[in-house]
A protein has these predicted regions:
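N-terminal accessory/capping or targeting/presequence segment of soluble
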Residues: 33-35, 40-80
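Short, charged/polar low-complexity linear motifs in solvent-exposed/disordered segments
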Residues: 46-48, 59, 95-97, 155, ...
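A contiguous, low-structure linker/loop signature
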Residues: 67-118, 129-137
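Short aromatic-enriched loop/helix-cap "lid" or pocket-rim segments at secondary-structure transitions
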Residues: 54-57, 81-85, 89-92, 149-150, ...
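Short, acidic Gly/Pro/Ser/Thr-rich loop/turn segments
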Residues: 49, 84-86, 144-145
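Active-site loop segments of alpha/beta catalytic cores
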Residues: 4, 8, 13-16, 20-45, ...
Length: 350
């Protein structure tokens, strides 16, 4: 794999004399294992992100500022200008699952029976990634909780955890079985080293459902899904939830998450690192809302980056804006954050 110490190393003359720099991949592994990283992992730099495969090619995604599209699950998505991501349209006409007690009549999982030939161009994309330098990383979204509310609408979904728990369990089981089939195809054809799996579990200040309810409805499914990936060649499971989810960290560890990306400052990250760092790494700490805004300045971004790095330290922490991809809503913010992280990194890793 890519963690052989002197394979594909680069010279670094910055500190006087010659020494070997870790590859981006090695540096991430050193960070999450509590080893000896020689710099910060800079946001998404270690991830060779792959989005395409035959399923995603057949399921349109909302594009920034473009008209709504209907995806393979029948959910109508739109991404309005000035907003951080796509979201379903949930008027009566567009809600897919109008009655959870009859969910089987409404929810039809997309096909996954694509031929080897249909996978070929996507295998070729994966083969372009230098696995010594990067993790071949499969992007997967939405997650189970998000899919539940994409299909039903958020209030309906939350009410149904209470009013129709049996039907909600059935729907989650159905979604889980489909995800496991999807995982099988991804591992067979793409052979990823990492997965980047989205599922937002809270608002800025609270989880959407209680920890007990989360444990009951979602922990078993995610143990199966992330367990499957780990058993089939995936080294690093990265889960995106740009929300409050501190109360769910023990379940994240149990389900096999290595890195929680999107960890907002409302989670008291320093406390989480002290308590759980040896078992999970926290990637975030720079709230998108605080820097990715119309009136942003390089000074503002650097100030926030510096605060995060000084507050959270160098072990089990990856500085990153909480946005769920290496992009920003306002052009230049992501790149400016990367430059600031590089600058602060040189000061903190002497």
């Amino acid at each position: 794999h890519g963690d052989r110490l002197f394979h594909d190393t680069r010279w670094d003359f910055k500190k006087g004399g010659i020494h070997f720099m870790l590859t981006r991949r090695q540096n991430l592994l050193e960070t999450i294992r509590g080893g000896h990283p020689d710099r910060y992992v800079n946001q998404y730099e270690a991830l060779g992100m792959l989005f395409g495969n035959p399923y995603t090619a057949a399921s349109p995604n909302a594009e920034y500022g473009k008209p709504p599209v209907k995806n393979a699950w029948g959910v109508t998505m739109v991404w309005p200008e000035g907003t951080p991501g796509g979201f379903p349209i949930h008027d009566e006409e567009h809600i897919v699952c109008k009655d959870i007690t009859h969910w089987r009549d409404y929810v039809k999982a997309p096909r996954l029976d694509y031929s080897d030939a249909e996978w070929e161009p996507f295998i070729a994309e994966a083969e372009k990634v230098d696995r010594n330098e990067y993790f071949v990383t499969q992007f997967i979204a939405p997650g189970l909780f998000e899919q539940c509310h994409h299909l039903q609408e958020i209030q309906n979904a939350l009410i149904n955890f209470y009013e129709e728990p049996e039907c909600t369990h059935e729907l989650i089981e159905y979604l889980t079985e489909w995800e496991l089939q999807y995982a099988e195809k991804i591992c067979k054809y793409i052979k990823p080293d990492a997965i980047f799996h989205h599922d937002d579990w809270g608002s800025q200040t609270s989880t959407f459902i209680s920890p007990d309810m989360f444990e009951e409805f979602f922990l078993p499914s995610y143990k199966k899904i992330y367990g499957y990936y780990k058993e089939h060649g995936v080294d690093v499971v990265i889960h995106h939830a740009d929300s409050y989810a501190a109360t769910l960290v023990p379940f994240m560890i149990e389900m096999g998450i290595d890195i929680w990306q999107g960890c907002m400052t409302s989670n008291n990250i320093a406390d989480l690192i002290a308590k759980y760092g040896e078992k999970i790494t926290f990637m975030g700490g720079i709230d998108s809302a605080s820097v990715d805004r119309p009136d942003w300045t390089p000074e503002l971004v650097e100030k926030e980056v510096r605060r995060a790095c000084e507050e959270y330290g160098t072990k089990y922490y990856i500085p990153c804006i909480t946005q769920g991809l290496g992009i920003s809503t306002f052009p230049g913010v992501y790149e400016t954050a990367s430059e600031a992280i590089d600058k602060v990194s040189k000061e903190m890793f002497k």
